[in-house]
């Protein structure tokens, strides 16, 4: 197994060691024409969600692009390559993580790295200040840091919408399955702490992300 459209030796993920059948596997077993698509930032989340018979896409954090492996495809689907050309992740690097509320409105006010008085507009220059483990090229450092912000959730939502449209999910009489996993909440929680303002603010934003995605799905399949 090898990664597709990535550096040699990277993204070599597959469900070859997955011993249990997933929901998608059972769906495909009952109807081989059903499509199963898994989308996640983390390759393990994508592989486990996609199962052994579906397809899985995950984020290459160094490039900010969506990838897969030769287990699922001979070549990365054309629509994914075209999507990656938009460089959506890179376009988010100039954005600031702006809190949804004033400091007093948060419940978890005991723990935060954010100085509200010094930076009232948000987490200015945030990407340059977190995760010193990323010491390679500046852009690669920044793109990987995106996953530790609510912008990581935005990457997943945007790609999931694209997958629904271009994989033509739900467009025939065969039941399709799309699994979407947001891994940024776990990363943000691990880095800032579960009782931090950062985690609380991220969940407010994630709630909107999920609402937008479910609203998009409902709009695609109105009777």
Where in this protein do the model-derived segments appear?
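Metal-dependent active-site segment of extracytoplasmic phospho-/sulfohydrolases and closely related
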Residues: 205-223
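His/Asp/Glu-rich, glycine-adjacent segments
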Residues: 1-174, 183-190
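Mobile, glycine-rich extracellular loop/lid and propeptide segments
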Residues: 181-183, 195
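Active-site-proximal segments of metal-dependent phosphoesterases and phosphodiesterases across multiple
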Residues: 194-207
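A cross-kingdom marker for long, charged
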Residues: 162, 199-201, 215
